[in-house]
């Protein structure tokens, strides 16, 4: 199936074309329509099959189409590691290249205070998409640095790995916000 056969936003499609992506992988073909319909889902596929695009593309399309608060965090994507959070953020920048009003911030530990200050600034400005490791996000939550009451999309990337790493209580706490 081709991406242009799906109901993706034109700005997202333009970014895909620039990146030379034309056809969906099976996980994308199955997940994208369901997310566009607003359905919850559990996507399971091997590494390298396009799972990140399977959830990012429809979320970015929906955010760019409007109907979500401009001054709010609308999507939280949880990642078990800093490296994966950075990869997701890079994918977000590529897929969202033509989106003028959709912003993101990657939040993860293991860096200096300057990075924390940048995270705090992005959170206070209301980044649309927050990509975070559980521990670092809990830190921001406990300090009251962000309002998560208007989140419409909640993604657990590599959920099995996060649970194996002992993040189940953190995830429950974040999901209840």
What is the predicted role of each segment?
Residues 1-44, 157:
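Conserved pre-motif I regulatory segment
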Residues 5, 13-14, 18, 68-142, ...:
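Conserved nucleic-acid-binding Ia/Ib motif block in the N-terminal RecA-like helicase ATPase lobe
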Residues 24-26, 33-34, 58, 80-82, ...:
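Proline-centered helix-kink/hinge sites
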Residues 29-41, 52-70, 90-96, 138, ...:
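Walker A/P-loop NTP-binding motif
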Residues 59, 78, 162-165:
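Methionine-biased hydrophobic packing positions in alpha-helices, especially
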Residues 141-177:
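SF2 helicase catalytic motif II
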């Amino acid at each position: 199936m081709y991406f242009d056969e799906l109901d993706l936003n034109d700005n997202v499609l333009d970014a895909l074309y620039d990146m030379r992506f034309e056809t969906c992988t099976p996980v994308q073909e199955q997940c994208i329509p369901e997310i566009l319909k607003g359905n919850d889902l559990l996507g399971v596929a091997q590494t390298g099959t396009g799972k990140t695009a399977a959830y990012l593309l429809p979320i970015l399309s929906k955010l760019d189409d409007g109907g979500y608060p401009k001054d709010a965090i609308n999507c939280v994507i949880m990642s078990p590691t800093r490296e994966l959070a950075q990869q997701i953020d890079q994918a977000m920048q590529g897929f969202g290249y033509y989106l003028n009003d959709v912003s993101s911030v990657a939040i993860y530990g293991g860096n200096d205070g300057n990075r924390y200050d940048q995270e705090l600034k992005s959170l206070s400005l209301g980044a649309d998409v927050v990509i975070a490791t559980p521990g670092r996000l809990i830190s921001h939550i406990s300090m009251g640095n962000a309002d998560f009451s208007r989140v419409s999309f909640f993604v657990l990337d590599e959920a099995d790995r996060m649970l194996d790493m002992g993040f189940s209580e953190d995830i429950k706490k974040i999901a209840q916000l």
